[in-house]
A protein has these predicted regions:
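C-terminal motif of bacterial Sec signal peptides marking the signal peptidase cleavage site
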Residues: 18-20
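Bacterial N-terminal signal peptides that target proteins for export
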Residues: 1-10
Length: 469
């Protein structure tokens, strides 16, 4: 009994001692707002020697085609673009005659890393289907950097990806923008300064998941009620924090609102820090989501899948909302039936921000061919779509959807040197990416397999130390 009393007294003493550790000199607690970026990028540009690409045929990602043009790369950036650039400092030259150059391709809808290969249930980490609203979860905490699918996408010229949670929930959580580079940690892949995103989902998926459990939502009206309830709570949470921070000098920390990870993400959307990426197929539901965003004062950055985008293309253009679409994937469920192959071309023709995506670990390897299919469909119906314009769907327009248009998506002076050299016309089924640079460093070379990372999984099961440097 004496030992128990002694332990009790010691524990009380330690509690009293450490309870004062957070106090300032005046006896009050330190006032701190929630950290908006608790898991910052640790990505570092890989050092490389400056080099000069000569005599290239370039699709610049902005809708232009440049002939016999040179690109000077230095310190991870595009330093100069022009004809017959002089090499006054003996930079390494790459003769790009008879080849094509494009910006690195951008896929704004991927689940690689959260649905990693091999596709076992143990690797199914993309849908936190335990509540219709899970804004508190972050895709980056599920990403496995060792997913062997990343290297396959790199071989297809994809240099930047938005990794999203799945669409089983009304509000599924935060997405993360990654550079397609080898890394032990996901933070080593995170694109520095990229805005966070929020995945929302319309339609069949949430009502199917929770309706099967006799929960709300089980209908589309239940979907809308669920979103609105969450945004009402978020507005109240934001107001509580605004009131506290605006008057924090007069209030002790004990009066600060209790932190809520779910509400913090939604508050970030309301403050414009987090971009909404909204899975939505039907035209009528897209308009409903736009109306709701105006009700609560947030902005939708992009609709994803957007099967019926062609029906509301002028509205998307007016609202400044990107439409992220497949070339010809449709009909796999009821809400995906009313699709036309000219969808992307028609949205682009209306002046909206048209973007192509994969949502698939196979299609991402051939995103250039997906662009070609969508371009051909538009051309057949009489729209004037050049290959240079179509490329914007996976370059500058995609960069806009990520909020990174000032850094990637085009061959321009000052942009990141994310560049793909193709061994032929990028839209030919016979063409492959020959070299892929990210921030000026070569990460893929079709003629030098040692350049490209090999995922640990692809090495097979080895004895410790076997066949390892």
């Amino acid at each position: 009994m004496k030992n128990i009393n002694l332990k009790f007294l010691i524990s009380i003493f330690l509690m009293l001692v450490f309870s004062g550790c957070d106090k300032k000199h005046g006896g009050d607690f330190e006032r701190t707002a929630p950290n908006k970026n608790p898991f910052p990028s640790t990505y570092q540009i890989k050092q490389h020697a400056p080099f000069l690409i000569k005599n290239a045929k370039i699709l610049d990602g902005l809708g232009n085609k440049l002939e016999n043009t040179d690109i000077l790369i230095e310190n991870g950036k595009i330093k100069d673009v022009g004809v017959s650039l002089k090499n006054n400092t003996n930079y390494t030259e790459i003769d790009a005659s008879n080849t094509w150059i494009t910006p690195g391709l951008i896929d704004v809808h991927s689940h690689m890393g959260v649905y990693a290969a091999p596709g076992t249930s143990n690797h199914s980490d993309g849908n936190e289907m335990t509540s219709p609203v899970t804004a508190e979860v972050w895709a980056e905490h599920s990403v496995w950097p060792g997913d062997p699918q990343f290297e396959k996408a790199l071989a297809g010229g994809v240099t930047t990806l938005l990794i999203l949670p799945g669409s089983g929930n009304l509000i599924g959580g935060r997405g993360v923008t990654l550079k397609n580079i080898p890394s032990i940690t996901v933070q080593g892949m995170k694109f520095p300064g990229a805005p966070y995103s929020l995945k929302m989902a319309c339609g069949e998926n949430p009502k199917r998941v929770y309706g099967s459990r006799n929960m709300l939502p089980s209908t589309r009206m239940g979907n809308m009620a669920g979103y609105r309830k969450a945004w009402i709570e978020a507005l109240e949470y934001k107001q509580e924090w605004d009131d506290y921070l605006n008057n924090s000098s007069d209030k002790p920390i004990s009066n600060a609102p209790k932190r809520d990870l779910r509400m913090e993400t939604l508050k970030g959307v309301l403050e414009g820090d987090i971009k909404v990426h909204n899975h939505c197929y039907r035209a009528d539901e897209m308009v409903q989501m736009i109306d709701m965003s105006k009700e609560f004062g947030y902005r939708i950055t992009a609709f994803h899948h957007t099967i019926e985008g062609y029906k509301v293309a002028p509205i998307l253009a007016k609202e400044g909302i990107c439409a992220v679409m497949w070339a010809d994937w449709w009909g796999f469920k009821q809400e995906a039936f009313d699709m036309v192959r000219e969808n992307i071309a028609l949205v682009d023709y209306a002046g909206a921000c048209a973007v192509i995506h994969s949502d698939d670990a196979i299609q991402i390897q051939r995103l250039n061919q997906e662009i070609a299919k969508a371009m051909s469909a538009g051309t057949r119906m009489g729209l004037d779509i050049s290959p240079a314009k179509a490329l914007r769907w996976a370059t500058s327009n995609a960069a806009t959807a990520l909020g990174l248009e000032d850094k990637i998506g085009s061959i321009e002076v000052g942009k990141n040197a994310d560049i793909v050299l193709w061994n032929g016309d990028p839209f030919s089924i016979y063409t492959k990416a020959s070299k892929v640079w990210i921030d000026g460093s070569l990460f893929f070379d079709i003629d030098n397999p040692d350049i490209t990372r090999t995922a640990d999984f692809n090495l097979g099961i080895l004895e410790p130390g076997e066949r390892r440097p």
